[in-house]
């Protein structure tokens, strides 16, 4: 929808501390599971960081999964809190998420509280109260005092997040990742493989249901800024993401091989109008990038880039 929001490190820190206060207020503690059914927005990142800080276990799904996909995954982990956004947009179309809430709660009895986020730049959709479920609006969190309690230190092996297999061979399988392992692996990939530096701007086109979302968020540990995008990557313009990358001075641009294939099919000419002066690295994942894909990047996007 063209909405842009920016937060400083200080603002992020304050918001996360308020979320910690909220978690403690509703009796969320270490090893409790927090499930998120949200688009890729700042509040989702903040809720994840807050969960990590108190030792809770995070798990997220993208709104495009649909109700059966969410129930298949979250019913296995028995979350105590569900974080959900009221709606999301794809290719200009508004899609109601909050109307799915009763069906989810009916099947996942472990959920005791629901935190509703509003889609960035849009008014919150109206929602009905649900019996025996405490429902909170994210605006309530903004009014809370920041948590000043010293955070507990957890073991290297303490659980951080639960991700899922694709579900192509039956029910999606839960995969629990430890905090120390994830942090160490991501720092290695970011700083050694991708040369991410403090003050870099890191972007990856991903939803919250893909492991690249977790990879993107961890770039904060390298003192880089992260750029979030939600929606259809070619809305109104096939080179939309590249235009954003240029405007935001992105240094690492992450996409899928399928995205590059689409640029090839649509014969997008990037070099002629988008200079991408700050861009150092392009990452492609999801499937192997073809020989044509490599050649297209160097010929049409940027010659002097680490791909």
Show which residues each predicted segment covers:
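Conserved AMP-binding/adenylate-forming core of the ANL superfamily
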Residues: 1-49, 66-71, 134-143, 153, ...
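A short helix-loop-beta submotif of the ANL/AMP-binding
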Residues: 20, 33, 39-67, 77-82, ...
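Conserved S/T- and glycine-rich ATP-binding loop of Class I adenylate-forming
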Residues: 34, 51, 159, 165-168, ...
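ATP-dependent adenylate-forming carboxylate-activation enzymes
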Residues: 38-39, 59-76, 88-89, 93-96, ...
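Structural core segment of the AMP-binding/adenylate-forming
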Residues: 53-139, 249, 256-257
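Conserved pre-ATP/AMP-binding loop-to-beta segment of ANL
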Residues: 116, 128-164, 171, 179-181, ...
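Conserved AMP-binding/adenylation subdomain of ANL enzymes
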Residues: 181-201, 210-251, 266-269
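Gly/Ser/Thr-rich phosphate-binding loop
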Residues: 224, 250-255, 264-307
């Amino acid at each position: 929808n063209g909405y842009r929001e920016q937060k400083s490190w200080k603002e992020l820190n304050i918001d996360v501390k308020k979320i910690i206060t909220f978690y403690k207020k509703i009796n969320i503690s270490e090893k409790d599971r927090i499930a998120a059914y949200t688009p890729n927005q700042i509040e989702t990142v903040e809720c994840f960081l807050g969960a990590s800080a108190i030792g809770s276990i995070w798990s997220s799904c993208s709104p495009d999964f649909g109700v059966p996909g969410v129930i298949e995954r979250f019913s296995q982990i028995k979350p105590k809190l569900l974080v959900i956004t009221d709606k999301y947009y794809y290719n200009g179309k508004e899609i109601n998420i909050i109307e799915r809430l009763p069906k989810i709660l009916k099947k996942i009895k472990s959920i005791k509280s629901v935190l509703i986020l509003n889609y960035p730049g849009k008014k919150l959709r109206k929602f009905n109260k649900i019996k025996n479920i405490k429902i909170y609006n994210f605006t309530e969190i903004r009014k809370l005092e920041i948590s000043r309690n010293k955070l507990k230190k957890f073991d290297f092996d303490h659980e951080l997040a639960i991700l899922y297999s694709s579900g192509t061979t039956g029910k999606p399988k839960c995969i629990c990742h430890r905090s120390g392992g994830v942090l160490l692996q991501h720092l290695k990939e970011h700083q050694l493989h991708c040369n991410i530096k403090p003050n870099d701007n890191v972007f990856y086109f991903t939803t919250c249901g893909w492991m690249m979302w977790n990879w993107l968020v961890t770039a904060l540990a390298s003192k880089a800024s992260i750029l979030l995008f939600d929606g259809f990557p070619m809305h109104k313009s096939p080179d939309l993401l590249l235009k954003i990358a240029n405007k935001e001075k992105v240094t690492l641009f992450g996409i899928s091989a399928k995205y590059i294939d689409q640029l090839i099919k649509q014969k997008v000419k990037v070099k002629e109008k988008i200079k991408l002066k700050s861009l150092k690295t392009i990452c492609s994942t999801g499937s192997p990038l073809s020989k044509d894909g490599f050649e297209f990047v160097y010929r049409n996007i940027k010659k002097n880039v680490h791909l």
